[in-house]
Amino acid sequence: QPTQGAIYTPANPRPDSPELTPGDLKIASFNVLNYFTTIDMGTGHWVCGPSGDMECRGADTPEELTRQRAKILAALSEIDADIFGIMEIENDKPLGVGESPDYAVADLVAGLNAEFGAGTFAYIPTGAIGTDAIKQAIIYKPAAVTPVGDFKLLTTAVDSRFIDTLNRPVLAQVF
């Protein structure tokens, strides 16, 4: 237990408010709350996650998935951002016949493009990220921004202070 108060010396003072400059990009983060295109079959069905050894999350029936997808697409459409940082989307599992990497985020992009027109939205193809059943994703409008270089991940391999077993890898992309 400390016996006296801490001595604080400000070394990096912050402005009272940020200096805003004119811009024309709309960037948003959106938590899709366990959006899985793989139906959750309940306890004991270990088919999700990058190793196919985790229970799925999200919709328990095809009808529930349809409802969840419609709500997410309605919200994303209303926000209409140029770049979306997506949280809690299904991480790639071992792929079956006819499946392609990033299938959950690809499904949302297909839904957005069905409303706004082919090619209006795209996503950063990452494949599986980390070991959890969920990951992050990035959806963007190619007419507004262009990815520069490859995406990057913050993991223990990049910085030993980032503990993979306690944190999901962080996804970043320069546009």
Language model: regions and residue ranges:
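Divalent cation-coordinating acidic motifs and surrounding scaffolds
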Residues: 1-175
